[in-house]
A protein has these predicted regions:
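Conserved beta-strand-loop-beta-strand hairpin that lines the nucleotide-binding pocket
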Residues: 1-10, 55-139
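Conserved short strand/loop->alpha-helix "switch" segment adjacent to the catalytic nucleotide/phosphoryl-transfer site
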Residues: 24-48
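Histidine-centered phosphotransfer motif of kinases
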Residues: 42-60
Length: 139
């Protein structure tokens, strides 16, 4: 039975060059609908990084039309962004080269979210990031 205190939206994303932009637009509209515009910049950036990582590392050769699934959940003072992809490979944070121009997306996620992690699934994995929702930020 669904928990009425949990609000959720999900979107299936295609593995194409517009994937990250589509994810940001979906996130922006969802945050606007939920009255959480104050979180938009950080959340959109993190969603973009998680989706780009999934696209780059998990689905480069898949033929599935919607291999990436983005879920946004609001519950108990938190907003959680979760990206499901078909790969079972764990995400890797690159702490080696602080000046690298690429490969630093999870460092950004780590810096902006209050928590993040990943879980293996029967059909791949989910990588998630959580943000604190200020009670004044939502309706």
């Amino acid at each position: 039975q669904p928990n009425p205190a949990v609000v959720e939206r999900a979107y299936g994303l295609g593995a194409d060059r517009l994937c990250a932009r589509t994810a940001r637009e979906f996130t922006q509209q969802t945050l606007r609908d939920w009255g959480l515009e104050a979180l938009a910049f950080d959340v959109e950036l993190v969603v973009s990084e998680l989706v780009t990582n999934a696209l780059r590392h998990a689905v480069p050769h898949l033929a599935a039309p919607r291999p990436i699934r983005l879920r946004l959940l609001r519950h108990a003072g938190h907003l959680v962004c979760a990206v499901h992809d078909p790969s079972d490979r764990p995400p890797v944070v690159n702490h080696e080269d602080e000046l690298a121009e690429s490969g630093r997306g999870l460092n950004l996620v780590e810096a902006l979210a209050v928590a993040w992690g990943w879980s293996p699934l029967r059909t791949g994995k989910v990588v998630w990031a959580a943000f604190a929702v200020d009670s004044a930020a939502h309706r």
